[in-house]
């Protein structure tokens, strides 16, 4: 009997251990079983493309995923091609997309059958500043000088930007309304192309994100005139750039988010896995250095606070586009 009792305790203990292992395994069961398609709804060389191509090898370096992340650019229709592609992958957790404010602007401007609510939100990774840039050989050393020159010659100065009815054009319209001037707005497929147009003097100015122009700036090819925000960029190497208000007396601000979405209808476990993955990404020293080097503002956000942010950002974008005459 004593031996039988001992066996009973042993069997019971084994059952508890095995059950615990099975439960733990079930809670952490989901992970990618094939390469993840990392969709960038913009062209190569732009801020979104740069970020995605930084994140992909970072995930591999720190062994955060059992499968690689393959970056795929789908820039057509100001991001609509990429959004619709991901929307069409319903239930597939092996597709993600890196989104910008065109998540809101593109469907508002084009009527494309897409809304950010059609996808599964994962996380906001960072906020991106905008800066007014000119060619380094431009005679204009300050934003005030440049604005006065543009104001004196309406429809003479070219402002290059990414897409039509997107962030760059919205900011351009903000400037036109604030200062009573008029640019010739020239759209390009991506921020990299926009930056190159300024270097090649095919445009007179841009409002590129810092990450899109920093290489040209450090090489002495372009010049920042003002940060389009209420406060200066509080990062090494960027603090000397005045705000638009400091440079011109007129206050202007616009920040763009960078976020991650999954297709609709993916398993909750997959969504949670990606939330955890990108939280780990943002905790790496490489990520923190990347934010500093590219003048990106740390702003990790998930869950209900992320949904609230997206709703408010959508409303703001709609209001600005209406004021700018981009939508009715």
Residue ranges and their predicted role:
Residues 28-118, 156, 164, 180-209, ...:
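N-terminal (or domain-start) structured segment
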Residues 33-35, 181, 218, 268-328:
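An extracytoplasmic/periplasmic, membrane-proximal ligand-sensing/linker region
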């Amino acid at each position: 009997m004593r031996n039988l009792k001992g066996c009973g305790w042993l069997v019971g203990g084994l059952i508890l251990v095995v059950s615990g292992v099975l439960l733990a395994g079930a809670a952490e069961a989901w992970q990618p079983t094939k390469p993840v398609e990392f969709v960038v709804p913009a062209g190569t060389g732009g801020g979104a493309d740069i970020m995605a191509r930084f994140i992909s090898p970072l995930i591999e370096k720190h062994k955060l995923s059992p499968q690689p992340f393959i970056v795929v650019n789908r820039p057509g229709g100001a991001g609509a091609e990429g959004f619709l592609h991901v929307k069409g992958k319903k239930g597939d957790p092996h597709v993600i997309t890196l989104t910008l404010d065109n998540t809101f602007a593109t469907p508002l401007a084009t009527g494309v059958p897409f809304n950010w609510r059609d996808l599964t939100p994962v996380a906001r990774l960072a906020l991106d500043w905008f800066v007014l840039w000119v060619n380094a050989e431009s005679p204009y050393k300050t934003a005030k000088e440049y604005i006065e020159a543009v104001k004196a010659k309406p429809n003479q100065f070219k402002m290059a930007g990414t897409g039509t009815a997107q962030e760059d054009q919205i900011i351009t319209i903000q400037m036109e309304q604030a200062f009573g001037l008029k640019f010739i707005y020239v759209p390009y497929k991506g921020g990299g192309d926009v930056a190159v147009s300024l270097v090649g003097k095919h445009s007179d100015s841009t409002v590129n994100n810092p990450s899109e122009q920093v290489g040209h700036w450090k090489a002495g090819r372009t010049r920042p005139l003002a940060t389009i925000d209420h406060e200066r960029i509080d990062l090494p190497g960027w603090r000397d750039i005045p705000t638009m208000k400091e440079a011109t007396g007129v206050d202007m601000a616009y920040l763009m988010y960078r976020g991650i979405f999954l297709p609709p209808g993916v398993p909750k476990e997959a969504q949670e896995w990606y939330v955890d993955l990108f939280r780990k990404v943002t905790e790496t020293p490489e990520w923190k250095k990347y934010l500093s080097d590219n003048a990106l503002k740390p702003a990790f956000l998930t869950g209900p606070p992320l949904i609230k942010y997206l709703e408010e950002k959508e409303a703001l974008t709609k209001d600005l586009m209406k004021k700018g005459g981009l939508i009715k």
